[in-house]
Amino acid sequence: LDFIGGYPNTDEEPFSAWLKRTKQTDRAIRHFWEPVIVGALNDTFERCSTRYAGQVFHESFLKSAEGGRLGIPSQPLSEFYAAVAQQAEKQGTRLHVRTSIDRIAAMPDGTWTATASDGSVHRAGSLILALPFEQTARLLGTLAENAVQRQRILPAMEHFIHAPITTIHLWFDREITELDHAALLDTRIQWMFNKSRIRRFEGGGAVEAGQYLELVISASFAEIHATREEILAAAVEELACFFPTVRGAKILRSGVLKEARATFSVVPGLDQYRPAPDAAGGNLYLAGDWTRTGWPSTMEGAVRSGRLAAEAVARGAGNQERLLSPDLAATGLMKLLTR
C-alpha cells in the first residue's frame, strides 16, 4: 500500500530497510521483489533506495496498464539505432564513429574544443558530455584545476559507484522452449530471452535451426569473480530446472559477457549529488542516466537525460521549447489515488 499513491520524495532509506519495516515475507521477497527490483535497478536491496524501488513498482504495476508493457528489440542494437543515425546525418549531423575524445577545453571566446585520440580538434559553441559518470569525470579532469565546470561537478563524482550485469548466450541444437521470454524464480538468472523466437519478428528470412537463448544475471557481483566455465555450468543447470529439454540438448556455441560497469547504483542519499544537465555552466552540458533525471539507472532515465540536456542547450539559446515527453498519465482508479 505504501506505493499506491506514489513513492517517497527523498532517497535516504535503503530498500532493505523498507522490506524489514513492512514485514515482507521471504517468499514475497524471492518471488516478487527480487525479480522486479533487482531486475530493474540491477543492484542489491541494500544499495537501492526505497524511493527508486517504489518508483519502479508504482510506474510499472500500479499507475497505468501502459507502464508495464515490456519492449524487446527484435534486432541487434547496432541495427536498431542505425536508422536514427541515418536520419541524423540527413539533417546535417556529422557522426565520428570509433573515435574517442582525450580532452576538452574552454576557449576564451566561450566556445569549446574536444581533442580526439587521433589529434583532430572539434570546436562547438555548446558541448554535451553524454557519457557514463566515470568518463565524464575523466574529461572534466582534463580541464584546468580552477575551471568552474571542474570544480562544480568533479567532487560529486566520488559518490557514484557501478553495478555489474552478466549475460550468458547459449546456442542449442534443438528447441528448448516456445516462450519468447521468461522471468526465472529462485535462481541467479533473472530473465531468459529466446532470441531465436524474438528475431522472427524481423521478417528477414528463415529462422536458423536449433535455438539461441540469452540469460541475464543482474547485480552479478559474484559472477564477476567467477570463471567462464563456472558461470556456464551454473546457468545451464538452472535453466534445466525450468526447461528439462536442456539436459538432452547439445550446446553448439556459448558466450559469457561480464559488464562490470553496466549501470550506476542508486544508493541511498545519491540524489543530492546527481547534477542537473546545466549544472556545469559555461555552455557545457551533461547527459546520462546518472544525472538528475528523477529516474533510476534505466533506459527511460537515459532517454530523459538526453532530452533534458537538449532542453538546456535550447534554453541557453533563448528557446523555451519542452522536449521531454510527458509522463504516462494515471488511468482508472489510480487517477484518484496517485499523488
Locate predicted features.
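Short, surface-exposed acidic
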Residues: 23-33, 148-157, 245-252
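Active-site catalytic microenvironments for nucleophilic, acid-base chemistry
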Residues: 87, 94, 135, 142, ...
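Alpha-helical structural context
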Residues: 21-23, 40, 139, 242, ...
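Conserved flavin/dinucleotide-binding core of flavoenzymes
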Residues: 180-339
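A structural signal for the hydrophobic beta-strands that form the central parallel beta-sheet
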Residues: 95-97, 129, 286
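Active-site/ligand-binding neighborhood in enzyme catalytic cores
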Residues: 1-104, 112
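Aromatic-acidic/polar surface patches that form glycan- and anion
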Residues: 8, 70-73, 77, 120, ...
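Mid-domain catalytic core of redox enzymes
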Residues: 99-246
